[in-house]
UniProtKB/Swiss-Prot annotation:
Record keyword Ribosomal protein present: no
Protein's name in the database: Proline--tRNA ligase
Protein source organism: Pseudomonas entomophila (strain L48)
UniProt xrefs under CDD domains: ProRS-INS, ProRS_anticodon_short, ProRS_core_prok
Quaternary data: Homodimer.
Amino acid sequence: MRTSQYLLATQKETPADAVVISHQLMLRAGMIRKLASGLYTWLPMGLRVMRKVEAVVREEMNAAGALEVLMPSIQPAELWQESGRWEQYGPELLRLKDRHDRDFCVGPTHEEVITDLARNELSSYKQLPLNMYQIQTKFRDEIRPRFGLMRGREFIMKDAYSFHADQASLQETYDRMHQAYSNIFTRLGLDFRPVQADTGSIGGSYSHEFHVLASSGEDDVIFSDSSDYAANIEKAEAIPRETVRPAPTEELRLVDTPNAKTIAELVENFGLAIEKTVKTLIVHGAEEGKLVALIVRGDHELNEIKAAKLEQVADPLVMASDTELRAAIGAGAGSLGPLNLPLECIIDRSVALMSDFGIGANIDDKHYFGVNWERDLPVPQVADLRNVVEGDPSPDGQGTLVIKRGIEVGHIFQLGTKYSEALKCQVLGENGKPVVLSMGCYGIGVSRVVAAAIEQSYDDKGIIWNDALAPFQIALVPLRYETDVVREATDKLYAELTAAGFEVLLDDRDKKTSPGIKFADMELIGIPHRIVVSDRGLADGNLEYKHRTESEAQALPLNEVLTFLQARIRR
């Protein structure tokens, strides 16, 4: 491809509304353009990258036995009403009416549609297992679209759905999809981690997320430094570093604490170590009108996902208001604690191993110091309530936990029978009786992968693409292309490289475009291999080669260029 025949839409300045680096560089490199909030047009340069992601996804999905389909992006409300999600989904679901006043939505996901397809096409266990996927445009009406493609409203997604007569078959396909996803992200050259995850609003019983590691990621990715254990922050089990509760060394005492409404103020004003404090959080109980106390150490954070799974606690988690606290306890949030508390208490594992600690006295501006379990109050129910922190023991007993930031690019679920029961998707089993199908769901954010790859690999000059993702593998930059000797050598090399199967962008812009601008554009776009053709180099029988990640260029004999590139470029 020649730049004279291409939409080379690079920009020198960074748009003011672009915050994250992938958004900035995709705009500056001429990959995308904003149409409206959360909506982007893919320009040729960006679309080449996305098509490469799609190609790898298709190859691995097909190799894993999945069948490609294409479902409508507009879905009838009746299917969502059958599943119960029409009312549940919230304002992110873009709803609309046709001219006949019938309700539809723009699909954020396709569980209902694929289940409807399966119930109409499948009748016997002999047709199972069946795994179908599509690469389709999705829409979620995010309240605050931001970060370009990282959190847009419209996005490209690969979503697959599998149907099974039993759990064993579902597990087999789930494992196959897990491996296919690992293959996809490995082939795309990404540093990623698959992690155990909560199933969230999709539902189901078992899931894994796939995260590209990047400092700009929105999610915490937890993994062991000595094993394959990995989980997201919601799912990671928090194991206390302590194994035995120390014996008491202090007496229980009631202390006036007028200037200690927070843990930080308690630590600063009274000299307590933060790990000797606790936070008492009052939440709504599962039983209407009931409140429950959840207690974590002062330096730990409550994990709301874990807390909401407790049978005594309302789901979703709702914190008690100040009015509710004063009516039930007689004190405000900064002065609460488990001693003489007229509510059911559940404490974190780390709290159960504390001694000589400080708690609120359930009287405004007063705390108890020197509190000890069993001596001053009984140990209540103990549960895993907190987020893990770096350095915690790995739950599998191997090593300690490391926390890095990640960008979620894939998610696989075992849905079970949630949707098939709601939509009555069943077949005749081997015994001739109806069997409700078990389902799996497997998604990859195709457009998000492009942005995540940039977040993982860039420098102050622009994007750094690997060979698998680059829009072009080679930037061919002639200096003084208007001269016969340079033009003839460049055109001959361009023909040889393209004939050999390389993707080449020939920068044939005229002499009004300086070599510096040409080099800067190719580095901004992130093309990994650059060949410079100059009359001076040709006089010596050489071309100049530079890799995007290298600081210095090297001379290559003209007759060795093709062999060199064939050995160097991953294809």
